[in-house]
Structure formats: C-alpha cells, structure tokens
Amino acid sequence: MAEGFVSFGLEKLWDLLSRESERLQGIDEQLDGLKRQLRSLQSLLKDADAKKHGSDRVRNFLEDVKDLVFDAEDIIESYVLNKLRGEGKGVKKHVRRLARFLTDRHKVASDIEGITKRISEVIGEMQSFGIQQIIDGGRSLSLQERQRVQREIRQTYPDSSESDLVGVEQSVTELVCHLVENDVHQVVSIAGMGGIGKTTLARQVFHHDLVRRHFDGFAWVCVSQQFTQKHVWQRILQELQPHDGEILQMDEYTIQGKLFQLLETGRYLVVLDDVWKKEDWDRIKAVFPRKRGWKMLLTSRNEGVGIHADPTCLTFRASILNPEESWKLCERIVFPRRDETEVRLDEEMEAMGKEMVTHCGGLPLAVKALGGLLANKHTVPEWKRVSDNIGSQIVGGSCLDDNSLNSVYRILSLSYEDLPTHLKHCFLHLAHYPEDSKIYTQDLFNYWAAEGIYDGSTIQDSGEYYLEELVRRNLVIADNRYLISEFKIKNCQMHDMMREVCLSKAKEENFLQIIKDPTCTSTINAQSPSRSRRLSIHSGKAFHILGHKRNAKVRSLIVSRFEEDFWIRSASVFHNLTLLRVLDLSWVKFEGGKLPCSIGGLIHLRYLRLYGAVVSHLPSTMRNLKLLLYLNLSVHNEDLIHVPNVLKEMIELRYLSIPVKMDDKTKLELGDLVNLEYLYGFSTQHTSVTDLLRMTKLRNLTVSLSERYNFKTLSSSLRELRNLETLYVLFSRKTYMVDHMGEFVLDHFIHLKELGLVVRMSKIPDQHQFPPHLVHIFLFYCGMEEDPMPILEKLHHLKSVQLRYKAFVGRRMVCSKDGFTQLCALDISKQSELEDWIVEEGSMPCLRTLTIHDCEKLKELPDGLKYITSLKELKIEGMKREWKEKLVPGGEDYYKVQHIPDVQFINCDQ
C-alpha cells in the first residue's frame, strides 16, 4: 500500500518537473541528478511493498521515501512560486528581482542536491537490506481512462432500498405496531452492536406508511459519541419546524422552551440514532415533557440506554442475518440487475461466495462491503484470491464472537485494500471529518483536487466519478442519491465501523493526525509530528499548536466546528504553516474581525474555506494566493465586510463564493477568472456584469442585480455561458418591485437544469423563453398577478416547482389536465392572496411530495388531489386548525388524502 502512496507522490513530482521545466532553467544539473535517483527509487518500490508487512525496517524505508518526495515537491514549488511573485516592471524592481533570483537559484540548487543525496542514501540502505529493482513496463490508467471505466460501471448501481430490506421485514412490522398501536411505551429502543443494521431498521420504520400517517411530525437526529446539547435540540426543532428560519439564531434556553412546548402539544416521532451512553440521554432529556404526545425511537449499542430513558421502554434486539439472508443480500449487491431469467452464477463462484459471507458474522455492513468488493471481480480466479485473502488470516463463523468480529474488520479492510491508489487517497481524506459528519460533496471534490488527487480542470466530473465508486463499493453512504442524470449526490457520510477502518488505515499510513485535546500527549504525539503533514482539529483548545514549528511541513489543516468558540488572536499564526495546501477555518472567530496578513505567506494554498467565520476585513496580502482552486468567503459578518480588489489575481480559481454583505468601497474586477465553474454571491453593486462574458466554463451562478441593470443587460452578458447548469437571479431589495422580465431569454441554455428567480414580474415569461431542459424552478417574491401554472405545466421536463413568499399574488390558480407530466415535488408557501386552487383530473400524474405552507386565505385542499395516486407525502404547515380537522380520518375532506401514506400537520393548531 505504501508503494502506491509513494508512486502517487512520485507521479505528482514528475508532473511538476515537466510542467515547470522553463522556470527551472539554470539548475538543470541538479534536476538531472534528482531525476536519476527518482528513477532508481521507483524501481525498488514494488519489491519494498511486497516485503513491508514482514519488516518494520522496510516500512520505515517507505516512510522516509514518502517524506523525501514531499520535501522535493515543496522545494521546487516554493522556488517556482517565489519566482512568479518576483516578476514585475521597472528598473529598480528588475535589479532587486535579479539579485533575489540568483540567491533563490543558489538555494534551490543546494536544497535539491541535499534531497538527491538523501534519496541516494535511502536507495543504498534499501539495496543493502535485499530490496530488488523491478522494472515495471505497465502503466496506471489515465484520468480519462478512469472516467470511461467509471461511466460503464455507473449503470450497475445497487438498489439500496431493495437490498436494505433483506432479513428485516418482520422486525419492521413489529416495531411499527409498537409505535402506532401501543400507548404503553413512550420509548422504543433498537439495541445491538455496530454494523448489525440498527439504523437501517430504524430508517425503514421511520418511513413506513402507517408511521407517517399516525404522527403529526418527524425528526431524525444522529447523536454519536461527541455531540452538543444545543446541536441535538436545534436539529430536532429544525426537523419539526422546517420553515422557521430563526432557529439557528436562537440561544439554548429559547430552543429548549420552544421544543418542550411543541412536544407537549403535538403527536411527534423523534428518532435519536446512535446514542452511546446513559449520560447522553441525561443531557438531552430536558426538552421531552412527561405528557405522552410524542414517541421516541432510539438506537444504541448499549441496551441500558433505552431503559434509562424510560423504565417502560420496549427494547428490540437487532438480530444478525442468517447465512441464507447474508448470501441473498450479497447477491443483490454483486448482481444488482440480475433477474430470475438470467443464467445462474457459476457454481464454484456461488460456493465461494456463500463461504465468504460466513465470515461476515451476519452483519449487514460487512456483507455489503463484501458485495461491493466482489462486484468488481468477474472470474473464478479473482473470487478465489478474495476468498484466500479472507480465509488466510481469519476463521469466521455465523455467530458474533471476538473471532468473527475480527473477520468483519478484515473484510472491511479488504474492501479498502482493493481500491486503486487514487481512490485510497480519496477514502483516507474522509478521516478528517468527525464522527457522523454530513460531508458536502462540492467542498469534498475541491478538497480532493487541492490535495492533487486529480487535475483541477475536471473537479466536478472527477469528484462525482470517484465518489460514486466509493458508494458503489459500500465504503461511503450517499444521501439524497437519485439514479437519474440531473440529480447529483449532495452529501455523504461514513458508517461508524467503516470510519474506524478509515482511521486505522490513516494512522497506519501516517496520513493525518486528529487532535481532540492538546493536553493529551497520546493524541498529538502518537506519530512523529515532523511526518504528519495533515492535521484535523476537533477541539477549540488546540489553538496554540497551530503556529508551532514542529508543524512547519503540514500541508492540510481542517478545523471542525465544535461547541466552544475557536478564536485566532495571533497575527503570526500562519508563519510556521507556509507549506499549507488546504486550510479550512469555518466558524473560526478572528480577533478584531481581521484575517491576519500572514495568510498571504501561504503561497501554496489551493483550498481556503472561511464559511461562517467571523471576519469583517480581508488583507490585501491575499493577492499572493495565486494557486487557489477553491475560495469560500461566505463569512458570518453582522457588519459590512471590505474585500480588497485582489481576487482578480487568483486566475486558477474554479470555485468562488463572495460575501453577501460588502461595504460600498468594495469594487471587484473578476473578468480574468476564466476558469471558474462555480460563482456564488456575484453582485453588480460591486462588480461589472460584463465580467461574466469570459467565464465560459461556469456551471453554477448566483447573481444579484442592482437598479442599473435589467434582463436585457444580463442576457447579453450571459450569452456565452452555455455550460450553465444552475442559475439564480436576484434583484436588490430596492428594485425588485419593478417589472424586469421584458427581455428574459434563456432558451439557448441547453444544459440549464435549475433556475431560481427573485424578480418582480407581473406575469411569467412564455414557455419558449425558458431553457428547453429545465428540471427545477424556484420563484420567490415575484408578485405575479397572472396564474403561472398554465406556462409552467407546459415545461415537460420539470420535476420540482417552488412558489414562495408572494411569488403569485392572484386569487385563483389552476393545474390543468395533462399538465406537469413529470413533476415530482411541488411547494406552495406564503402565497398570502391565494384563495382557490383547482387541480384537474390527469394533472401532475407523477407527483410524490406536496407542501402547503402558510397560505392563510386558501379555502381548502384541491379536490383533484384524490386522483393523484402517486402522491406519497403531504406536508401542511402553518394552516388553520379547520384544515387539520377536515383532513384527519372522519373529517369531511378526508377522502382527498386517504390514499396518501404520509400526511403531516405542522403548527396547524391555531
């Protein structure tokens, strides 16, 4: 494995030497010597990797080599970047630049000679130890070849909803009955070891038709080992009142009072997933009243947690799969599209498969991981190699004991070992994130690019390919996954046991350090600080270590959000972190609101994230960050922030998020950022709309227009952005009450799938003015006087429509027969003038979810909903009590919704 990491590093180093050959002229002799030693080194790696398991000495050799490759890359890139920074005009600058150039060239030549000598010494030691040269004529797949293969295997995605049901059908039925029909138990607990399927079982119950009809509202919160009381309460309240935008600003006591009152008056189901200790419940319980309106479904590895929460608790012990169920689940993952009519699996392979699943101990997680591993193997010899790898080190069984648990971890480890090197890198980078973190994929893809896993020009596509492969192998869990082209994986997570494997492998490869408490020496010094080039900080108490000299070689620093405040008070905090490629300071508070000027010294940075950070002033030294691919400036600032006009120098940027609130002095020139793919917060108050003309690679754009502009100007500036997939247009508060839709023409954007308009318009544009393949449309504050539905229902690719905040100010709205042929989701919120809504039979035949929120004058639910048999979920929020009384069983309008499995009433008691 280490050989793969070293080879990966060598490949990046060769690319750097080739790419910067012109700027490296003058040190040819030193570089030639380095290249000779690198070639010799590469020929030793395969034999070293084969021998590393039996020798600590060989493992140390490989660690030394990895450090040397990193050091060489740092030296060469620093030289190139300093040379770029020195380029300028004027005689004095030229003289100073020449003197500095000669000094730098002498230093880099000396440094390269030093690295070359160290490599030569390691090679000599390796050869003396008996490591042989192996000249490998093969080659690794190029990025394009990997993507081609990935496109082929994407068609065989397993149906997780189907596979998850293996062996749990009866358990789901029993749990549903206890929650819906039995009032004796306030708390129902699912207990069992990690990986046994507690969360899967709870999820099936949570979404069951009878459960969705029985309760008024639902909340799902993952508690995990490290949590904060406020965060758990906040999440519950957000799920029960999803449209309350003030929850994030509430203090702990306000949340507690509001949540207590809510649970006291309604019939709600709250799922607390992964509660570890009795004490965890004691920290959470204050919001749950004694009155029996709510019910709780709780999952835990500790059977005593549920009984501690409620002495009358019903404890359900999750059971392992039997051998037949294990093989059935494995088959569904290995052959997701095989049906009864197809040729049976080779008998020898089936026999091996059934033998291998016995080593999974009946744990669904291990069975899925094994299935993901075997899905890439198509011959008897390949299956036999997997079987031998499992059987050679463990002896499994069908019951859970220490031995079979070892076999489970062995199978999970084999799934990792089977990954190609680039995917091993992707997987290990997930170790940065705290337990049960929701990982946003757009940030993750840019993070992978900043770490050099793939070329910066293909960030989104490459990231999607790699993540889908990790999901397909059941190493990562994808949330909101849809197997249709217009949807993307929005976020992902890791199962606890898989995360343990990830952390173990990261430690084994000296890949990163996780720092939870700097007073704990074992946390910091578990490995040599000089070799830990990635730090992940999970505690605000760890501040003082950031600028320590022993971290001078750190390349990645990620600060995770935690309960206590994290302050940066030292202006020199970045002085000893000059080799950073990745820096995530989300939610960090900077003293005086100033980002330290020393950040300008981080010239290697590719990724800088300040999301939610308390910052009101950015330094002009940021102009030095010329290699940035990703820059997120979505800071949390109550005051206006000043952004110096330095972003124009970051021409490598692919992702840019600009602060929403900037002072009037901020004027930005962004026209040279031609590599941008994602641009958020673009405002014509601070930037010229014509800057967009050359950004032809843009895929996602959010633009705010001031009173100086109209749609004609905007359309002209967007005309070349033919790769746009998502576009949001907002007019400033001063001007959105003026009709600007006369020149609205977006029909030439053939790739545009998502459109959001916060624009005043008396009527919606004609259907021919819209993009031809539009899938999602969001209309806010439009003030349309004419019914938009006759136009929208003719956009035949639409799958979701949101009308919010007086998008329509008329009284009557009609969805006609044969309209909205593909619509899946409809949200009608805060349409304060709407009185009558007609849905004709044959309209919206594919609708699955419908939300009606705070439409105070709407008289009743449309009668035509009774014809929409596809409807699975109806959310009614903030409507009068009469609505609820009419629509519950026995109510006069119940016939309209009796076919809908999940009908929720939220805040409908006024």
From Swiss-Prot:
It holds the Pfam family WH_DRP. The keyword Coiled coil applies. InterPro entries: Apaf_helical, LRR_dom_sf, LRR_R13L4/SHOC2-like, NB-ARC, P-loop_NTPase, RX-like_CC, Rx_N, WH-like_DNA-bd_sf. Keywords: ATP-binding, Coiled coil, Hypersensitive response, Nucleotide-binding, Plant defense, Repeat. Residues 15-57 form a coiled coil. Gene3D superfamilies: 1.20.5.4130, Helical domain of apoptotic protease-activating factors, P-loop containing nucleotide triphosphate hydrolases, Ribonuclease Inhibitor, Winged helix-like DNA-binding domain superfamily/Winged helix DNA-binding domain. The keyword Ligase does not apply. ATP binds at G192, M193, G194, G195, I196, G197, K198, T199. One of its GO terms (molecular function) is ATP binding. Residues 146-459 form the NB-ARC domain. GO terms for biological process: plant-type hypersensitive response. Belongs to the disease resistance NB-LRR family. RPP8/HRT subfamily. Disease resistance protein. Resistance proteins guard the plant against pathogens that contain an appropriate avirulence protein via an indirect interaction with this avirulence protein. That triggers a defense system including the hypersensitive response, which restricts the pathogen growth. In contrast to RPP8, it does not specifically recognize the Emco5 avirulence protein from Hyaloperonospora parasitica. This is Disease resistance protein RPH8A. It comes from Arabidopsis thaliana. The gene is RPH8A.
